[in-house]
Amino acid sequence: MKTDLKHGDFKQLDKNLWVLDGELPHHLPLPRSMTVFRMNDGGLWIHSAIALDEKRQRQLESFGRPNYLVVPSKMHRLDAPAYKQTYPSIKVVCPEASRAKVEEKVAVDNSCENEFQGSEIKVHTMPGAKPIELAYELPLASGGKAMVFNDLLVNVTEVKGLMGRLLKFIGRVGAFRSPPSNKLILINDRALFHQWLDTQARRNDVKIITVAHGDPVTEKISQRFTEAAIQI
């Protein structure tokens, strides 16, 4: 697997859950994050893939066999072709509503909604949000659940440089939240999405949240969901 973009090391969040951060093209200061989950059969579920150098690729393979490549939206197709080329048998899945756009870059085997029906991975079509991206609920070996989001919620607390200040000004940077631009791009009913986030805040089984941009949330989960809901 070849990449010219920098990335960090894998960080283990639970026995079967890891994240890895990388940079975007053109030196954009907004970080991107990949989530890797080892399923019950030992295969890997990879969300918002980041192309890896040889060392991290071997580390990924030590976790398990790459089985699923989740392309979460048309905005996260960048490294999907590299994964398909490296792992020809990997199954490429995406939200049904994003399939046409994703297939402009890589062949899609199935929709997430169909592929994971009845499996250990629960797919959430979020009320009030356009179905072009989804949320995913994963069982943790330590007990409880992890939830994986794409662009609807971010958790970027620090960026550098002039472009970073611009991103902060337009609301792309901040503690766990839905950026203001989502109200035009990804959210079609703010009241419904607020209600859905509020419902998640009342759960006590979510222990970890990962996002495609920013750090994972591992503490005060209910409070963070409530804060995100208030900002919608």
Locations of the language-model features?
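Zn-dependent metallo-beta-lactamase
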Residues: 1-41
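Metallo-beta-lactamase
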Residues: 2-3, 9-11, 25, 45-46, ...
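Short, hydrophobic/aromatic-rich segments at coil-to-beta transitions
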Residues: 15-20, 45, 118-122
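Pre-active-site segment of Zn-dependent metallo-hydrolases
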Residues: 26-67
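Active-site metal-binding motif and surrounding structural segment of the metallo-beta-lactamase
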Residues: 51-94
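Short gly/pro/ser/thr-enriched loop/turn and capping motifs at secondary-structure boundaries
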Residues: 77-78, 99-102, 155
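Short His-Asn-centered micro-motif
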Residues: 47-50, 70-74, 94-96, 126, ...
